[in-house]
């Protein structure tokens, strides 16, 4: 019976090699601070008794079963061997800790977990996110041109001296995505370099919803962003998911905030985008400060549950765009 052991090992090795040689499914994640991710991982008693942290969610009887998937058999954070992430200067298997700091998460955790379970192919997430960036200026797509209004005396002077400020992070996103695709063999162990650019996940909007001019042109800027990004990545039908900037939840009443959220939803309803762009409402994922680590409305109160739910819902929307069950 002993010879069967090496034979069995060989079978598993061949199966593993076959899996690794499948084209990698690549998804781009982009936005500002809430795509970076400010959801706390560790349950610090000094932060509201740890409520709303990922660790707390794995221990709270009300959520422990649902969040057990993020833990391995030893109780440590599970590292997926079929989903990988590249986020600025960090990369590796998807696990808790790929937020703006190593003890934080963003939407990438829930997003990658759902898609990793959905695909037989390995998955790579390329996350390009920077805090405090607007679509009106920083991510402004080429087709939108220069803002047709003054940004203020100092800002106008800075742009006159350096026009590259306009759209800087749009171009940086394109550059980083292309660099990651070129390095895919290093980013995804076992990859032969083949990939399928499968989707783009956008979560951004705070810096636009606090500026009336940015809010007024958000829908047109977002539409140009989608068109330009598809062109620059040579992916004319690339599915896009827009996760609402729903901080404040269902009780939000600020007219500009509501207008910005409506603009995000309306993009997906434009005739050319129906069936290839999806809007994901996020206001229901809001958790009050009483259930969260910190009182920071602009960062979803740093609640890990919120970030996981945004990611999961956006992945489900992506699956629908990709015609997956």
Model-derived regions: residue spans:
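Positively charged n-region of N-terminal signal peptides that target proteins for export
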Residues: 1-4, 115
């Amino acid at each position: 019976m002993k010879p069967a052991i090496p034979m069995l090992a060989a079978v598993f090795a061949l199966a593993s090699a076959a899996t690794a040689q499948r084209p990698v499914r690549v998804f781009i994640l982009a936005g500002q601070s809430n795509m970076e991710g400010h959801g706390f991982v560790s349950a610090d008693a000094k932060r509201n008794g740890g409520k709303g942290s990922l660790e707390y969610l794995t221990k709270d009887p009300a959520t422990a079963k649902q969040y057990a998937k993020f833990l391995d058999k030893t109780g440590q954070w599970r590292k997926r061997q079929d989903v990988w992430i590249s986020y600025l200067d960090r990369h590796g298997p998807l696990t808790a800790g790929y937020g703006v700091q190593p003890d934080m998460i963003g939407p990438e955790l829930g997003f990658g977990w759902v898609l990793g379970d959905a695909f037989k192919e390995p998955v790579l997430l390329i996350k390009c996110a920077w805090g405090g960036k607007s679509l009106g200026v920083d991510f402004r797509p080429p087709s939108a041109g220069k803002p047709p209004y003054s940004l203020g005396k100092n800002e106008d002077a800075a742009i006159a001296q350096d026009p590259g400020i306009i759209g800087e992070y749009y171009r940086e996103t394109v550059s980083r995505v292309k660099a990651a695709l070129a390095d895919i063999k290093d980013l995804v162990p076992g990859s032969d370099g083949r990939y399928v650019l499968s989707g783009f996940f956008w979560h951004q909007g705070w810096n636009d919803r606090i500026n009336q001019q940015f809010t007024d042109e958000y829908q047109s800027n977002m539409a140009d962003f989608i068109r330009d990004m598809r062109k620059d990545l040579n992916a004319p039908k690339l599915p896009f998911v827009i996760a609402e900037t729903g901080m404040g939840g269902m009780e939000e009443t600020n007219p500009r905030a509501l207008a910005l959220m409506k603009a995000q939803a309306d993009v997906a309803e434009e005739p050319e985008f129906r069936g290839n762009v999806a809007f994901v409402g996020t206001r229901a994922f809001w958790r009050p400060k009483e259930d969260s680590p910190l009182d920071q409305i602009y960062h979803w109160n740093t609640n890990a549950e919120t970030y996981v739910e945004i990611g999961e819902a956006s992945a489900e929307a992506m699956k629908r765009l990709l015609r997956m069950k």
